[in-house]
């Protein structure tokens, strides 16, 4: 029989809905299901319910030891080759607690990060381009759960590529080839666009290009295998990759950046007159995350929000909220006729909006609570 996993509450949590469970700091709980970002647990009174996964931590030493072992096997520490992720039938100790229903421990597959990703929620995992993560769980909504550098969390699956059985050396070689491709032909190639930097950017590796806000650059290549990054040339001749959401295309698009075009104008977005929630002042339809960020930063106040169509899932939506320091984005899934955000379910989007005007949509570990105060105007 599988060993029961014990978790301990790191913070107090008060249930917001019937299917959730109140917990107290340092309370011991039994873990029943950890396949989502909210975990199902049982308390000493035999009551069960969902709690935020970042409010509890595992205290099961055998389970921790197994996780370390699985990670070592996957990374090949102390071995010439990595051990296959399929459990060895000759290892009954592993079989004794691998539960087929716990997807967290079923995968342990390496994947390589294609693009940088900054976590927006406390249960997400930040990604650094060029590093390797261990994929622990895959969900049908396009988000995967994995571990990197001792941290565990969710990230968008299209930011990584699976390398399965490829040895680490192959990946290093591919990075070398990628770098060589950037270095070669520095001063060749047609100018596709002239862009101006919206924000300063500091490179994290030799492939990328440093620039300051307002810098004008030529776009000379759009790598097909790296769609979020453009290859640009600065006026001093330096060439490298830049994140495309940090720049805007100049309107007149001169042939070279030696000209001095007028500063770019950001599009003014407004509530949508088409789409599922057309006519609602908070619905902005098909705008990008970047456009939402720009609008909230330019004319929003803390607590202002908008709802937009999801870029990654055609039938889903995102709530973008102006917050102190860093704006927040929350995914809303439409399952049949129900709108789901985390473990909470609402029959209409209007009901969801009204709920989070009264109840916090986000609570930090420090106790900071964020609400939907009013729609962006």
UniProtKB/Swiss-Prot annotation:
SUPFAM superfamilies: SH2 domain, SH3-domain
Annotated ranges, domain SH3: 2-61, 106-165, 190-252
Keyword tags: Acetylation, Cytoplasm, Endoplasmic reticulum, Nucleus, Phosphoprotein, Repeat, SH2 domain, SH3 domain, Translation regulation
Modified residues (Phosphoserine): 85, 89, 91, 96, 166
GO MF, one example: receptor tyrosine kinase binding
GO cellular component, as recorded: cell-cell junction; cytoplasm; cytosol; endoplasmic reticulum; nucleus; plasma membrane; protein phosphatase type 1 complex; ribosome
PTM sites of type Phosphotyrosine: 105
InterPro entries found in the cross-reference section: NCK, Nck1_SH2, Nck1_SH3_1, Nck1_SH3_2, Nck1_SH3_3, SH2, SH2_dom_sf, SH3-like_dom_sf
GO terms under biological process: actin filament organization; antiviral innate immune response; cell migration; ephrin receptor signaling pathway; lamellipodium assembly; negative regulation of insulin receptor signaling pathway; negative regulation of PERK-mediated unfolded protein response; negative regulation of T cell receptor signaling pathway
Post-translational modification N-acetylalanine, affected residues: 2
Domain (SH2): residue spans on this chain: 282-376
Entries under PROSITE patterns matching the protein: SH2, SH3
Result for mutant: residue 143 to K: No effect on RASA1-binding. Almost complete loss of RASA1-binding
SMART domains xref list: SH2, SH3
Annotated consequence of substituting residue 38 to K: Small decrease in RASA1-binding. Almost complete loss of RASA1-binding
Top-rank taxon: Eukaryota
Phenotype when changing residue 229 to K: Small decrease in RASA1-binding. Almost complete loss of RASA1-binding
Post-translational note: Phosphorylated on Ser and Tyr residues. Phosphorylated in response to activation of EGFR and FcERI. Phosphorylated by activated PDGFRB.
Subcellular location per the Swiss-Prot or TrEMBL entry: Cytoplasm; Endoplasmic reticulum; Nucleus
Assembly behavior: Interacts (via SH2 domain and SH3 domain 2) with EGFR. Interacts with PAK1 and SOS1. Interacts (via SH3 domains) with PKN2. Associates with BLNK, PLCG1, VAV1 and NCK1 in a B-cell antigen receptor-dependent fashion. Interacts with SOCS7. This interaction is required for nuclear import. Part of a complex containing PPP1R15B, PP1 and NCK1. Interacts with RALGPS1. Interacts with CAV2 (tyrosine phosphorylated form). Interacts with ADAM15. Interacts with FASLG. Directly interacts with RASA1. Interacts with isoform 4 of MINK1. Interacts with FLT1 (tyrosine phosphorylated).
Entry function: Adapter protein which associates with tyrosine-phosphorylated growth factor receptors, such as KDR and PDGFRB, or their cellular substrates. Maintains low levels of EIF2S1 phosphorylation by promoting its dephosphorylation by PP1. Plays a role in the DNA damage response, not in the detection of the damage by ATM/ATR, but for efficient activation of downstream effectors, such as that of CHEK2. Plays a role in ELK1-dependent transcriptional activation in response to activated Ras signaling. Modulates the activation of EIF2AK2/PKR by dsRNA.
The record's note on its domains: Only the first and third SH3 domains seem to be involved in RASA1-binding; the second SH3 domain and the SH2 domains do not seem to be involved.
Protein name, UniProt field: SH2/SH3 adapter protein NCK1
Protein encoded by which gene: NCK1
């Amino acid at each position: 029989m599988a060993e029961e996993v014990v978790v301990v509450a790191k913070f107090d949590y008060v249930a917001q809905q019937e299917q959730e469970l109140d917990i107290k700091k340092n309370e011991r709980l039994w873990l029943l299901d950890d396949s989502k970002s909210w975990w199902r647990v049982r308390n000493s009174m035999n009551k069960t319910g969902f709690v935020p996964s970042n409010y509890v931590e595992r205290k099961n030493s055998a389970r921790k030891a197994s996780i370390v072992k699985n990670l070592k096997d996957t990374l090949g520490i102390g071995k010439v080759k990595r051990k296959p992720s399929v459990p060895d039938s000759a290892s009954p100790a592993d079989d004794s607690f691998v539960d087929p229903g716990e997807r967290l421990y079923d995968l342990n597959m390496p994947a390589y990060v294609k693009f940088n990703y900054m976590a927006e929620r406390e249960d997400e995992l930040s990604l650094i381009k060029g590093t390797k993560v261990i994929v622990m769980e895959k969900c049908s909504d396009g988000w995967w759960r994995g571990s990197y550098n001792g941290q565990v969390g969710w990230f968008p699956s299209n930011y990584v590529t699976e390398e399965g059985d490829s040895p680490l050396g192959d990946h290093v070689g591919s990075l070398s080839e990628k770098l060589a491709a950037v270095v070669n032909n520095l001063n060749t190639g047609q100018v596709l666009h002239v862009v101006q930097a919206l924000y300063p950017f500091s490179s994290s590796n030799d492939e990328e290009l440093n620039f300051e806000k307002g810098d004008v650059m030529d776009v000379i290549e759009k790598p097909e295998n790296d769609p979020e990054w453009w290859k640009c040339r600065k006026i001093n001749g330096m060439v490298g990759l830049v994140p495309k959401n940090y720049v805007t295309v100049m309107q007149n698009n001169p042939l070279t950046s030696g000209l001095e075009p007028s500063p770019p104008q950001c599009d003014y977005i407004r509530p949508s007159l088409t789409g599922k929630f057309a006519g609602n002042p908070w619905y902005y339809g098909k705008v990008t995350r970047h456009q939402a960020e720009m609008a909230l930063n330019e004319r929003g106040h803390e607590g202002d929000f908008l709802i937009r169509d999801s870029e990654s899932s055609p039938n889903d939506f995102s709530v973008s909220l102006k917050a102190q320091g860093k704006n927040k984005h929350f995914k809303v899934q439409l399952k049949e006729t129900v709108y789901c955000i985390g473990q909470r379910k609402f029959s209409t989007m209007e009901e969801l909006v009204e709920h989070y005007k009264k109840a916090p949509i986000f609570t930090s570990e420090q106790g900071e609570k964020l609400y939907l105060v009013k729609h962006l105007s």
